[in-house]
Amino acid sequence: MNTVTINNKEYKLVYSVRAMMLFEAAANKLFSLDTLSDQYLFLYCCILAGNKDTDLTFDKLLDSLDEDPSIFTVYTDFMKRELSRQAEFKGKDEKKGEEQGKN
């Protein structure tokens, strides 16, 4: 399971449509992770997507990141795994499409 510990509390990290939609609503722009601010905001959205009843605010998250930078390292490792997983699915879908085209 993908989790991050913030202030001695464990939160589930979820990369999902919900997380992307939360990001777009909060950032008031289309989903893209171009800046450090985007990354921090998406980390928060991944936490919200996995922990609907959390009382963690974005401001509290930023304070925690200042105190414990390893939180962001956990997030970047999580993102690497998620992007790798998505690339695998994309590769399988493309290969499947090529095989179907041969029929």
Name each region found by the language model:
Residues 37:
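Histidine-centered catalytic/metal-coordination loop motif
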